[in-house]
């Protein structure tokens, strides 16, 4: 007991750690965690009719009331969908109290308190250029929503994923992926954080150094234009090939590298 945990990682990172399992192993350890204000994780087993989350705590159960299900910087009310979608997934929380029952106590939990601590001690201090782990929670055509700690969400726009153009983020990532990102902006008034990934993939020169003129390389067709076909050789490196019939965006292609022009940052294929 009392060992420190890196608790400000994306939600789900703590649940299988030895420390977390130890805290959930007995009534005494759960009470210790409550008194010490330790952030823990458990799996949300169900959402009841009042939209409270019931969480598995080893041999015990805990309840996160709807109003304690999430922290909002602007004070907006927790949406039903934000609670319901946590069912079956790990949730972070602090133990705030107990309700004594006939057989076992039920623990009162607050995910909001755990997220508030993460915001105050980590997220609010993030600055442009800071690098962090992010877990992709879901994907839309305009970008990826990412958990950057304790279920707090930031946006990775599609045009910040790579220099090479992609039509949809799913061409790079899927929900559940844990990736490295850099903070692009942090609006502390609205709580909106924007991430970028492409700067971590190396410069054009670093990517081009892996290829030489005269080589044949595998690439992915990213766009087809009247004047040629853009083929991605690496996430931050694409070249222009001559137009040919039968090319399909997203398909793999073998291309011959005609020339690499560092001064123009161009690759002719």
Predicted regions, residues:
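Single-stranded RNA-binding regions, centering on S1/OB-family and related RNA-binding modules
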Residues: 1-269
């Amino acid at each position: 007991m009392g060992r420190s945990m890196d608790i400000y990682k994306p939600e789900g990172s703590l649940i299988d750690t030895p420390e977390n399992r130890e805290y959930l192993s007995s009534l005494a350890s759960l009470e210790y965690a409550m008194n010490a204000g330790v952030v823990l994780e458990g799996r949300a087993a169900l959402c009841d009719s009042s939209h409270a989350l019931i969480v598995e705590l080893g041999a015990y159960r805990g309840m996160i009331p709807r109003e304690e299900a999430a922290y909002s910087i602007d004070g907006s009310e927790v949406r039903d969908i934000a609670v319901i979608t946590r069912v079956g997934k790990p949730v972070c929380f602090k133990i705030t109290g107990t309700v004594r029952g006939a057989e076992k106590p039920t623990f009162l939990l607050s995910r909001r308190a755990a997220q508030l601590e993460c915001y105050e001690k980590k997220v609010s201090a993030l600055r442009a250029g800071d690098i962090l782990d992010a877990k992709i929670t879901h994907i839309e055509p305009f970008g990826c929503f990412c958990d950057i700690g304790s279920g707090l969400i930031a946006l990775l726009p599609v045009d910040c994923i790579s220099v090479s153009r992609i039509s949809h983020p799913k061409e790079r990532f899927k929900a559940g992926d844990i990736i490295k990102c850099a903070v692009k902006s942090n609006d502390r008034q609205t709580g909106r954080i924007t991430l970028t990934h492409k700067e971590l993939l190396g410069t054009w020169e670093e990517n081009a150094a892996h290829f030489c003129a005269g080589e044949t390389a595998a690439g992915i067709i990213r766009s087809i234009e009247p004047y040629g076909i853009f083929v991605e050789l690496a996430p931050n490196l694409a070249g222009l090939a001559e137009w040919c019939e039968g090319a399909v965006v997203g398909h793999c292609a073998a291309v011959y590298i005609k020339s690499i022009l560092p001064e123009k940052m161009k690759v002719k294929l």
